[in-house]
């Protein structure tokens, strides 16, 4: 297939994370030399901590901030934002003397809103995708105050039968337009077929149009997983997770919106499950979890490999 320029890499682990007792060996970084922040979920908690660089072989929960699981990290303007989805809270931190110091008050969103993604337009404006409400909240990330909201119920394809929530997920801004992936679920993890993306003018915060493509299903995956992303050419890529492999009629794959365009590129469709991947059982993966585009046509991701699935689960 044309233009399949992704280099697919199955990563067993990206970072080694262990929970250590106080007397375990643990790398001590210079306080003013922390360059990375990461989050790891263990049980019902998410542990957020800093470390120096990728030469660090292990980290510890000893100095971590603890949040509820399904908490997501975002960075902007030197600050770190933690979006706690299940508890519907947004926290803002700065790095000082090797520690995360909270700035401003915690922003509390409505119960059940399930905030899952944060996209920054400027120091005064950002968008939160509220999966549980079918809305985008507009906030000032500097003051941590809500400044508006965008109701997306009009774009729910199940609205005629009473479903007014299109489940907004991950998003990205390109050339003054916010591109928001919509899961369009019939029930949890059971999407309507097709990929749906809503385009919003960031100057007016008014929706422009919703575009769709029947080659893949479920644009983005409720929460941050490394897409949508924009490459060096300005082309925008969206991964459709296809119902996480549960439904045969819900196909996965990458779709593209080329620079200067606002519709899906009909010449491009890249499904992962059609690719033969060496050195894994069955040589096949059926969808991608988290992913990172690193430039020069290269993307790293965590793949779901059916050949390693056991019943009962191990």
Regions found by a protein language model. Name each.
Residues 58-67, 101-110, 146-160, 207-215, ...:
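Beta-propeller fold detector
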Residues 66-78, 111-121, 159-170, 218-228, ...:
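Repeated scaffold domains used in trafficking and secretory/extracellular systems
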Residues 22-109, 115-121, 125-149:
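Acidic/polar, low-complexity intrinsically disordered N-terminal segments immediately downstream
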Residues 284-314:
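Loop/turn-rich, solvent-exposed surfaces of beta-rich toroidal or solenoidal domains
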Residues 41-44, 87-89, 132-135, 185-189, ...:
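Short glycine/acidic-enriched loop and turn motifs that connect beta-strands
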Residues 140, 192-205, 250-262, 314:
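Beta-propeller blade signature
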Residues 1-37:
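Bacterial Sec-dependent N-terminal signal peptides
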Residues 31-37, 79-80, 125-126, 177-180, ...:
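Entry beta-strands of beta-propeller and related beta-repeat scaffolds
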């Amino acid at each position: 297939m044309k233009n399949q320029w992704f280099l697919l890499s199955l990563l067993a682990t990206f970072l080694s994370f262990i929970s250590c007792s106080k007397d375990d060996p643990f790398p001590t970084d210079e306080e003013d030399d922390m360059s990375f922040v990461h989050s790891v979920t263990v049980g019902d908690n998410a542990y957020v901590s800093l470390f120096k660089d990728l030469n660090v072989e292990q980290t510890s929960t000893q100095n971590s901030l603890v949040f509820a699981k399904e908490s997501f990290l975002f960075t902007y303007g030197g600050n770190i934002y933690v979006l706690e989805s299940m508890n519907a809270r947004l926290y803002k931190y700065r790095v000082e003397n090797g520690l995360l110091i909270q700035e401003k008050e915690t922003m509390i969103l409505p119960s059940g809103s399930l905030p899952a993604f944060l996209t920054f337009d400027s120091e005064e404006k950002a968008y939160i995708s509220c999966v549980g409400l079918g809305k985008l909240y507009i906030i000032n990330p500097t003051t941590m105050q809500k400044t508006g909201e965008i109701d997306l119920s009009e774009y729910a394809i199940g609205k005629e039968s009473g479903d007014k929530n299109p489940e907004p997920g991950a998003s990205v801004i390109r050339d003054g337009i916010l591109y928001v992936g919509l899961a369009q679920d019939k029930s949890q993890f059971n999407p309507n077929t097709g990929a749906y993306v809503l385009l919003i003018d960031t100057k007016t915060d008014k929706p422009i149009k919703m575009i769709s493509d029947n080659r893949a299903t479920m644009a983005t995956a409720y929460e941050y997983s490394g897409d949508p992303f924009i490459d060096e050419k300005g082309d925008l890529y969206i991964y459709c997770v296809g119902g996480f492999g549960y439904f045969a009629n819900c196909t996965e794959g990458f779709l593209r919106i080329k620079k200067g365009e606002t519709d899906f590129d009909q010449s491009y469709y890249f499904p992962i499950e059609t690719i033969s991947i060496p050195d894994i059982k069955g040589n096949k993966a059926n969808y991608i979890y988290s992913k990172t585009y690193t430039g020069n046509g290269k993307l790293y991701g965590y793949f779901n490999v059916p050949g390693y699935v056991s019943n009962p689960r191990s």
